Structures are given as C-alpha cells and as structure tokens.
Amino acid sequence: MRNKKKFNEFMNKTIEELKDEKRYGTAHVYQSTLNAFCEFCGCKIIYFHQLNRATLKEFETHLRDKQLSWNTVSTYMRTLRGAYNKAVDQKITTGNSRLFNHVYTGVKNDVKRALEVEEINKLLNEVPLKRLPEDLVRCRVWANLMFQLRGMPFVDLAFLHKSDLKGNTLSYRRHKTGGQMIVDIPPTAMELIRQYQNTDCNSPYLFPILSGTKTGEELYIELSLIHISEPTRRS
C-alpha cells in the first residue's frame, strides 16, 4: 500500500521548525528546494511514495536542463535527502538507504573563486571613489573593509555594533558560529570606519547597513535584500 502521507506538508512543518530555531538561512534552502521540486512535479501536493529513484533522477536532469550548476543540484538533493531521512527517523515513511545513491550529492571545486591580492587591489583601488555612483561607493567601501579586516564576512560587517569598536581594535562574535574574534584595525581601515560609520544615535550598529528596526526573520530578509540589491540600487 502506498504511503498517502504528504511530503510537502512534512517539508512545510520542517521549514516552520527551522524558523522557530532562528535558522532562517536553512529554512530558505528548504523552501527553495520544495518550490523547485513542486514546480518539477507540476503540483503542490507531493506524497512520500513519489520520492523514488526514477523521479529523483528525472529531477536531477530537469535541474541541469535549466542550466543549474552541479553544486546547486547537490544542494537540492541533499536537502531532500535530509528531509527524507528525518521523516524515516520519525517513522512517517519507510526508509530506502540507497534512494539517493544515483543522484549527485557531492561538491565540485572546479571553479576558481579566490582572487589574488593584486586582483583585489585592482578592484578596490583602480577607479577613484569620486568617479563612482554613491551605491557603488558604498559597495566598494564595504568590500575594502572586509578585505582589510582579515577577510570579514559581509554578515559580520553588517552586524558589528558600535560597542564592538574599542580604540584600534574590533572585538565581536561571529554571526554564524558565535566564536569570539579580536581584530586589529589598520590605519587605512580606521579612516574608512570614521568616514562611513553610522551617525544614527538610535541604531546599535557600527555601519548604516541594517536599519536596526527589524528582528528575527524580517532581519534575515532585510540583510538578504541588501546583499542582492546593493550594487544596483539607485538613490
């Protein structure tokens, strides 16, 4: 007898649980995976019995036909596998240990993502700031600070608090891991900090990247939109 329990309902429940745990990035990946799988299946209701080897292989082919990278395909497949294994553990469906063996779930490192120091210097310094639009000026300032502050991730830069700045040192916790970081600020970076630091006395943030008025999922969405739209936004 086929399992009449709905996989999409289980995925939606998992997404809400992730949001309750404030794991908004993971919840977004689960939602994107569910959307892509529903679009492939041509329906919003998906039963667990539809998760079979043939369907998964066809889904993989469908994603590649849409020009998605192998790493994106792997993300979707690993997300489906994670949800499926969780459902098996909860005895919502019976398990097939080899269900995902024939679809790609690895990570390809065939694309160079790192830049040489000379390339970074060229990007950050070749064109004078005064010749750039205001939105690109801000983007380059943030990139310059991230580079000078020991490769600080953008999310950590955005969440820096005014209280994290102590003289010529930044003392803060990594947003993703919670690990304590202490960074000495080079003179050139300090000059940028003084020039572009937040002037809003009501905001706790060191830089005017986040509004300071949002929390939880709204804050995650705000940061995501800034990360996507900053290079093309016009004042």
Predicted regions located by residue number:
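Single conserved hydrophobic/aromatic residue that forms the stacking wall/gate
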Residues: I226-S235
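Flexible interdomain linker/hinge and immediately adjacent N-terminus
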Residues: K57-E58, T93-P128, S211-E218
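Major-groove DNA-contacting interfaces characterized by cationic-aromatic clusters
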Residues: K108-N109, S171, L192-L225
